[in-house]
UniProtKB/Swiss-Prot annotation:
Protein name: Phosphoribosylamine--glycine ligase
Pathway membership, UniProt: Purine metabolism; IMP biosynthesis via de novo pathway; N(1)-(5-phospho-D-ribosyl)glycinamide from 5-phospho-alpha-D-ribose 1-diphosphate: step 2/2
GO BP terms, alphabetized: 'de novo' IMP biosynthetic process; purine nucleobase biosynthetic process
Classification via PROSITE patterns: ATP_GRASP, GARS
Naturally occurring in which organism (per UniProt): Methanococcus maripaludis (strain DSM 14266 / JCM 13030 / NBRC 101832 / S2 / LL)
Family under the similarity heading: Belongs to the GARS family.
GO molecular function: ATP binding; metal ion binding; phosphoribosylamine-glycine ligase activity
SMART domains, alphabetized: GARS_A (SM01209), GARS_C (SM01210)
Positions contributing to ATP binding: 140-202
Keywords recorded for this protein, A-Z: ATP-binding, Ligase, Magnesium, Manganese, Metal-binding, Nucleotide-binding, Purine biosynthesis
Underlying gene: purD
Length: 444
């Protein structure tokens, strides 16, 4: 069974591992760098940019896969899924138009408005900097609301800036908005949104164009340093619970979040056609219930590393069910176990990360700790590993409870040597308790 995988990060390493649990799978991967974890699992690798559509076509024509799985968002944005489907290859990953739920923040917000989907917030879109943009921010200030500045296109999760975090106040938000236009960050179009106050969580679904099957809820930790301090990153780690909920998330709130995602899928279908792939909703649990911050048209990273290792159902079967519109024909189950994922990242990340420095990894010690190792932005050359400037590698602990899973992950992450750092508090009971207390305060 030939499977084409596009992507070379930790998320794709998790996808590759999950696929290879089926002994019939022969994996063929197109990726930019030599990720040693994915490389070891692949029959053949094409080293090309994941947005190089001609290279994707050439590799697919050569290997003739029976199914394709697209990991990152960038190939979706250039129509890789459209191309593969046109070639007659069943593909997991939405086509270019449905993928706009991630690639165009304006499309997403307008969809919520048009179809009256719950969980939306006050926003406005702008094509240039001027009095209208300034007036909208001034209006938010008069309402006592801080704002979030979001370049409308893809920025690899690095373009969004929030008042109270990267920005001092709404006046500084205006300065950053002007910079986005001056430098054409994310395509030179902007969404200004009200800043939500609450606790974040993520919810994933397998989507086959009509049906959505939900995965366990996960909490990511975007801040660089312990105690949720420092700049926003792509995610320093995450955890999930044995009951597939989260300690601060009631069943009622989880149900509301699921209904928002269900209506989103139906609305995408009506607007631009069927959505087939993984859908990841980033939510904020506020005093008014769950609000959607943004959607991603793929697995979250790090969340994929929490979810895929505890998937009991054959992942290849799930992928075919997604591509063929048959999710209602299979039973998808996850183990009732806790997971804790911790990332090791280059010193200086995400502002000014060191690059091309050697990273020593004691794989045996990580295995002895009963953790799973996932390689991310790593390049292997002459048997040595080098960090490339983004998140380097992650470890995942799995156990009957959060406390034990965290201990496994923590023991494992101490086995990296190089110019790197990590957060030691992810999955700890102290940090989780703070989340619970914060939600209690919101309810008052």
């Amino acid at each position: 069974m030939k499977v084409l995988l596009i992507g070379g990060g930790a998320r794709e390493h998790a996808i590759a591992m999950a696929l290879k649990k089926n002994e019939l799978v022969e994996l063929y991967t197109l990726m930019k760098n030599k990720n040693p974890g994915i490389y070891a699992l692949s029959e053949e690798v094409s080293f090309n940019s994941e947005t190089d559509v001609p290279a994707i076509k050439e590799f697919a024509e050569k290997i003739k896969p029976e199914i394709a799985v697209i990991g990152p968002e960038s190939p979706l944005g250039v129509g890789a899924s459209d191309l593969l489907e046109e070639m007659g290859i069943p593909t997991v990953g939405p086509k270019k138009l449905p993928a706009q739920i991630e690639t165009s923040k304006e499309f997403m917000r307008n969809l919520f408005k048009k179809y009256e989907i719950d969980g939306s917030l006050k926003y406005a879109a702008f094509n240039d900097y001027g009095t209208e943009l300034e007036g909208f921010i001034d209006e938010m200030t008069s309402l006592g609301k801080d704002v979030v500045v979001k370049p409308a296109g893809l920025t690899g999760g690095k373009g969004v800036k929030v008042v109270g975090e990267q920005l001092k106040d709404n006046e500084e938000a205006k300065i950053y908005a002007k910079e986005v236009f001056d430098k054409s960050i994310g395509g030179g179009k902007i969404i200004i949104e009200e800043k939500l106050v609450g606790v974040e969580f993520t919810l994933h679904g397998f989507v086959d164009g009509e049906n959505i099957v939900f995965m366990p809820a996960v909490q990511d930790h975007p801040h660089a340093y312990n105690n949720d301090e420092g700049p926003i990153t792509g995610g320093m780690g995450s955890y999930s619970c044995p009951n597939h909920g989260l300690p601060f998330l009631s069943e009622e709130m989880l149900d509301k979040a699921e209904k928002i995602m269900e209506k989103t899928v139906n609305s995408i279908n009506l607007e631009v056609g069927p959505y087939k792939g993984f859908l990841y909703g980033q939510f904020m649990l506020t005093a008014d219930g769950p609000k959607i911050i943004e959607y991603n048209a793929r697995f979250g990273d790090p969340e994929a590393m929490n979810l895929l290792p505890i998937l009991k159902t054959d992942f290849l079967d799930v992928c075919f069910a997604i591509a063929e519109g048959k999710l209602d024909k299979i039973n998808i189950e996850f183990e009732n176990k806790a997971t804790v994922c911790k990332y090791v990242v280059p010193n200086g990340y995400p502002i000014d990360p060191v690059r091309n420095k050697e990273l020593a990894v004691d794989e045996k010690a990580i295995e002895d700790a009963n953790a799973i190792l996932f390689y991310a932005s790593i390049n292997e050359e002459n048997g040595k590993l080098y960090i490339t400037g983004s998140r380097s590698a992650a470890v995942v602990g799995i156990s009957e409870n959060i406390e034990e899973a965290e201990k496994i992950a923590q023991k494992a992450i101490e086995n990296f040597k190089g110019e790197v750092y990590y957060r030691s508090d992810i999955g700890t009971l102290d940090l989780i308790k703070k989340r619970v207390e914060r939600v209690k305060k919101l309810a008052k």
